[in-house]
Structure formats: structure tokens, C-alpha cells
Amino acid sequence: MALPTPSDSTLPAEARGRGRRRRLVWTPSQSEALRACFERNPYPGIATRERLAQAIGIPEPRVQIWFQNERSRQLRQHRRESRPWPGRRGPPEGRRKRTAVTGSQTALLLRAFEKDRFPGIAAREELARETGLPESRIQIWFQNRRARHPGQGGRAPAQAGGLCSAAPGGGHPAPSWVAFAHTGAWGTGLPAPHVPCAPGALPQGAFVSQAARAAPALQPSQAAPAEGVSQPAPARGDFAYAAPAPPDGALSHPQAPRWPPHPGKSREDRDPQRDGLPGPCAVAQPGPAQAGPQGQGVLAPPTSQGSPWWGWGRGPQVAGAAWEPQAGAAPPPQPAPPDASASARQGQMQGIPAPSQALQEPAPWSALPCGLLLDELLASPEFLQQAQPLLETEAPGELEASEEAASLEAPLSEEEYRALLEEL
């Protein structure tokens, strides 16, 4: 039994244009005999087909092909008219015996198949004389072989169209592995999924040009200087690139964002693994350039910039660092003793010079301790003035009692405190 094969309209032009069997023209009497037999049984057996072939003078294989084509036409017509296909009628008849092919015959057929997958009628008749098999069985053998092994055989017809077709100019159609690469935040090329294609089959617009631009990132001589060397900062703008950007349209891989460390943690308490995660963006504060975990330098912006800047690189190299005073700036005030008076704290605040313009700009977080900021807020004159009306709303008796308690418990000066300590 022949395996299902593509129709003549779907075969390549090379197979269709080769020497084919001449079309058989049926006479009216032959057509009537065939149709009468078809009405009785659409699926005649080998014995019925042989008797019909002898009666009308047509080879039995041609009678079998006629019944196959007639069943296909009737099935299409029943589907268009939404009628059920009756199927087999009567008892099933005997089928053709399976043709036994010897080893020598198979070797001859395989050699012919390797030379040509679509032999013409002349080649099939020659093989029939050499092997002793009927030509119709040889045709069925080639159909089954093409269906079971579509990639084998010689003189494979070239398929028209498609991205991975043969290269123009007579190039060999053997596939080649083309890998697209891109450059990420690490400054090195990463291979993308491989795509099998024939050489020269890719379009010259998008992927080929992009892969050519991304290829220099894979060269060792060009990738080596990118490690550990800081490039000059841009003259204008808030963006700085520590690694070459990927080409337009090149493949990319998503990377986890890199978050700055907690402002309250010191450098020793931070988790180096968590803070060292690679990421496409990094937040940095003004400061010197520091080398990344892998040795790639990331250049910080000039110290005149006070606002945080975003750069494509290894990650936050100096983000969340402790505040470092500039030249000529006073150090941050230290927290006063618990028993010091409010006037002493106000004097300390007045003695501190105003911060520079760079420090007055808003920052993501403050580097000063929270306790010191709370003391400064409570001791500020503006806060005391705003809180004075709340103190005056108390009852006169309570206000006098609080004033007497305040007069009895006056704060001790530094000399009195030292004298009290010496007496104790």
C-alpha cells in the first residue's frame, strides 16, 4: 500500500518537469464499465480489478489509480453537499499480496534513490527490467521511500522562498550556525540562541548588520582594555556608560535590578553578595571612582554635582556611603550630652557654618543619624516658638507650678557639675 504523497500541484518543478507517464485517455465504454463497478463497490479487491482490467484492456495499476481518484472526487463532493460518505459496501474483498523485495533488489533501488529521488518513467522501467519487479511497484516503493526519509536521496529539489534557502551564486546549501551576540553591563559579548541558516540566506538589513556590530565585543584584544580602565566622564548630561551599549535591535537578556544598600548600615554590616548583584543601572554619589567586583572601573561624576546620577555599569559603587565633607566645610555636629541645656545646643547650631550648595540639594536619604536630627529639630528656635502657644494654654495654677518647679530645678553649669562630682 502506498503512503500518502503530495499531489502533483505540490511537487517541485524539478520533479514535475521530469519524464512522466503519458496521460491515459479513457474511452466512453471503459468509463461506463469503471463507474458501474464503482457503484457496486468503491473499494474493489485485487481479483475484481484484474478481471476489470482484462475486460476493458487497461493495466491493473491504472485501474487502481482510477478508483483512488474517483473516491477522492466523490468524497469532496459529499463534503460540499454535507452528505455522509457511505464508505465500503458489501463484504471486504481480498487485497493484493505484499510484494517481497530481496536484498539485491533493495540495493539497486537504494542506489537509484541516492542518485535521484524522483525518477521518471524511463528510469523506473529500466529498474523494473533490472530487478524483475513491476514498474508500478517500483513507483510505489519510491513514494514510500520519499515519505519515510524526506531528507535522504540525491538531487533534492531546492525549495523556493524561505529565510534559510540556498545561497545565491551557486553556494553550497549546507547549513551554518549563526550566533548573535550582544554586549551587556559586563562589557563582554553573550551568545544568543543559535539559528541554523544557510550562508548568505540572511537578510542584509537587520540581523546581519547587528551581529557584525556586536562581533567586536567578542574579540579578546578589544574586550581586555574594558576591564579595570575608567573612561572619561561625559561633558554634559547625567548618564555615564561604563560598558558599550548593545547595538540597535540586538538580543538582550533581562538582568536583576541593583538596589542601593540601606542608608543606616555601615560598610562592614552590608551584605557584599546582596550589594554586589549585577544590574543594568547604578546609583552613585559624588566621590572617587571605585573598581567593581570584577575589576571593571566605574567613573563617578565630578564632585561639583550634588544630585545623585544614574549610570550604566556594575552597580552602586559609592551609593549610601557616609557623608564626607568637602574642602573648607565643617564636620557634622556631634550629639550633645544628655544633661546639656537647650541654650548650649542652640549655640552649637549657630556656630556651624551653613552647608554648601551641593549639600543643600535634595538627596535620596540623609547620612546624619536620626537621633541628631531629632535633637536639632527640638532645639531649633522655630520649633520652640511654635510650641509656645501650646504651653500658654495650660491653666494658671499648673503654669505657676511648672514655673516654680523650673526655678527650683535650674540646670547646672559645667563648673557646678564638676564641683558636685568632686564633692561626691
From Swiss-Prot:
Residues 278-302, 319-329 have a biased composition (Low complexity). Transmembrane segments: none annotated. May be involved in transcriptional regulation. Residues 1-24, 72-102, 148-167, 218-362, 388-414 are annotated as: Disordered. Keywords: DNA-binding, Homeobox, Nucleus, Repeat, Transcription, Transcription regulation. One of its GO terms (cellular component) is nucleus. One of its GO terms (molecular function) is DNA-binding transcription factor activity, RNA polymerase II-specific. PROSITE patterns: HOMEOBOX_2. The gene is DUX4L2. This is Double homeobox protein 4-like protein 2. The keyword Metal-binding does not apply. SMART domains: HOX. Pfam families: Homeodomain (PF00046).
